[in-house]
Amino acid sequence: MATIHRLPSLVFLVLLALGVCSARRALLTLDAGYGLGHGTGGGYGGAAGSYGGGGGGGSGGGGGYAGEHGVVGYGGGSGGGQGGGVGYGGDQGAGYGGGGGSGGGGGVAYGGGGERGGYGGGQGGGAGGGYGAGGEHGIGYGGGGGSGAGGGGGYNAGGAQGGGYGTGGGAGGGGGGGGDHGGGYGGGQGAGGGAGGGYGGGGEHGGGGGGGQGGGAGGGYGAGGEHGGGAGGGQGGGAGGGYGAGGEHGGGAGGGQGGGAGGGYGAGGEHGGGAGGGQGGGAGGGYGAGGEHGGGAGGGQGGGAGGGYGAGGEHGGGGGGGQGGGAGGGYAAVGEHGGGYGGGQGGGDGGGYGTGGEHGGGYGGGQGGGAGGGYGTGGEHGGGYGGGQGGGGGYGAGGDHGAAGYGGGEGGGGGSGGGYGDGGAHGGGYGGGAGGGGGYGAGGAHGGGYGGGGGIGGGHGGNVP
């Protein structure tokens, strides 16, 4: 009997609760509709509200959509011709999009906010478009602008806690993508009938940047590995390109410039860095590669052709460069904890080579209006030096813990000179030749030998303990 008496009370409480919920929903809907219904182009609001509006002498419209916990999505368009914009806000984020156009032009933009935001915008008297997407805790920015009959577009995507940036103008475009905790940057610019493009991608905790500029064509690429960064760029009235890639905890940079053609490449290994660049009215190129904890640098310059190469081993560094109105080249390679340097210069031909052994260093260089070459190699804890000028050549080799071996040759006119130096354990050898002369020097253990020759003579010196 008591249960029967409780039924009317339970029914009354249920009906009362339903009435309160319905009244609350009606009030919220009225509030949201009032806040969003005043955009010129109309708008629609989700859970957290959004804003959209558009206007123009021709036609304009905008819409915005907000996702869960979104601070809002913004979209708007204006134009004497046509303009439109749309924005989307994701989880706990905001997306921004806008477009504008004048004359018969049109502008379109898209912004998508992943968790915590994205932005996109476009402008253009011709046509402009932009796109932006934000990943988790990140922000993406994209924009495009164009004038005349030109067009511009930009795209970017932000990864987790990262950001990407892309811009484009004229006939240019850019893209940027950000990885986990990183950022990617990409941009392109072009003038006249030119075209420019760039791309950048960021790995975990790293960043990549790429950009291109050019009245002709310019392009760049950059990619960042874990905790590292890569940067690449190209510039040129003719064509220029660059590439850079960064390994773990390292960085690589590459760039190219040239009225004719220029290119560069740089790659960084673990904890190291490589840099390469090329410049030239004719053609110039460079390459640099860095090994573990080391770095390599290479560059080339030349009205004719110039090239250089540098490679770095573990904890070491190598550098190589070439310069020349004719042709110049250089090479350098390094072993563990050491360094090698090589370079070449010449109006005719010049070349150099250097390689470094463990904890040592080798140096080689060549110079000459005719032909010059040099070679240097370093043994364990030692160093070798070699150089050549004119029609001469030199060689130097360093032994175990040796102060080094030194060799050099010089020659003038039709003359030729050569020199050789060899350093033993803890010792040093020196040799040199000038004119039509030659010299040799050999150093024994803890000793040193010296030899020299001039004219058409020769000399030899040796010291053994």
Curated annotation (Swiss-Prot):
Question: Where would you find this protein in the cell?
Answer: Secreted, Cell wall
Q: Where is the signal peptide?
A: 1-30
The record's keywords, sorted A to Z, are:
Cell wall, Cell wall biogenesis/degradation, Repeat, Secreted, Signal
Repeat: is it a keyword of this entry? yes
sequence repeat segments run: 205-226, 227-248, 249-270, 271-292, 293-314, 315-336, 337-358, 359-380
Give the main localization category. secreted
Name the tissues where it is expressed.
Expressed in young hypocotyls.
Q: Which GO terms describe its biological process?
A: cell wall organization
Q: Where is this region: 8 X 22 AA tandem repeats of H-G-G-G-[GAY]-G-G-G-Q-G-G-G-[AD]-G-G-G-Y-[GA]-[AT]-[GV]-G-E?
A: 205-380
Q: List the disulfide bonds.
A: none
- One GO location term (cellular component): extracellular region
Which purpose does this protein serve, as stated in its record? Responsible for plasticity of the cell wall.
Q: Give the domain section of the comments.
A: The repeated domains of the protein form a beta-pleated sheet configuration.
- Write down what this protein is called: Glycine-rich cell wall structural protein 1.8
Q: Which organism is it from?
A: Phaseolus vulgaris
